[in-house]
Amino acid sequence: MEKPVPGNPNGHGCGHNLLGAGALGAAIVIKEYLKATGKSGTVIFYGCPGEEGGAAKAFFARENEWAKLDAALTWHPDDVNQVVTGSSMACIQKEYIFSGVASHAAGAPEQGRSALDAAELMNIGVQFLREHMGKNASVHYAFTDAGGVSPNVVQSKAKVLYMIREATVQDAVKLEARVDKIAQGAALMTETQLSTRFIDGTANPLPLKTMEQLLYKNFVQVALPEYTEEEWAYAAALKNTYESAGLPSYAAKFDENIAQTVDKATDGGKRALNDFLMPMYHSSVTLPGSTDVGDVSWQTPTGQINCATAPSMVPGHSWQMVSAGTTGIAHKGMLTAAKVLAAAAIDIID
């Protein structure tokens, strides 16, 4: 089951290969409804590339595109059927670029100014910063250029990409400023030059209970997928390839009554597929992770659902999610999303 597929087939570690098609399906249904009834209304299908890190919706927001709308609806593949509630982290992506002087690491080390040392010192400084960050803050990094592959060279260039998250945009910007100072200090210590490249930023979503209730009402009315024996068997086999503990859905983590309901429906989390609708739940809790849907919500009322496209409690950004993303399970979840979004949009129009 875990093996590379030749070529460049469809698939994504977070199910994003299903996102656009599900939303497009909803747009087509709404269009046909307007044509059939003669009612007036405008439905716009937005293609938003780079949602995994390019934050296209934030660039739309910069141009005030979402402010033109009466409402915005979207969905995200998941292992459960539920209405999304609460918020998530504001996030800033930024690359720190250090430039130094190359030299022979043994023959003339004193002539070198190591950009790699600067990047590593920056990372160490950020580790010490963690103790003094807010409880909602998190910082992640990855080397995008470590300078080279020869250890006997003082590396003259290094790049490290940071994701800086906080509960609000304002707090994320403040944390970014502290990370900037650490980078500046690392450059000062190593006598290297620092430059930065802002990549993108996303805002924390604004939860809207009224929109959540509208989506849930329509979710209840849409028939959820029925799976074949083969799909159940596939899901069970895939579920056996990863560790899973606890119960699916964040609602079960915060609400004891919902936890009891989910525990019963999933046989204590052992069930391979979540073929039911999670109970209605509204929260203002800030969850980990980030989404550019947040930028939309600051300009127009926004609602989002999750639909089951993979086995229960499948880890995100995993080969298991990729594998599930081209199956009938995923396609059924995608079509469910189209139906729920279309029905909710029609209610808004009416």
What is the predicted function of each stretch?
Residues 116, 120-350:
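Metal-dependent amide/peptide-bond hydrolase catalytic core
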Residues 13-30:
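Active-site alpha-helical elements of protease catalytic centers
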Residues 25, 55-59, 110, 174, ...:
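Generic recognition of short, well-ordered alpha-helical segments
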Residues 2-11, 17-18, 34-155, 165:
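Histidine/acidic-residue-rich, glycine-tolerant segments that coordinate divalent metal ions
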Residues 1-13, 99-103, 276-280, 318-327:
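Glycine/charged-rich beta-loop-alpha catalytic/anionic-binding loops adjacent to active sites
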Residues 22-25, 52, 288:
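Short secondary-structure boundary/capping elements
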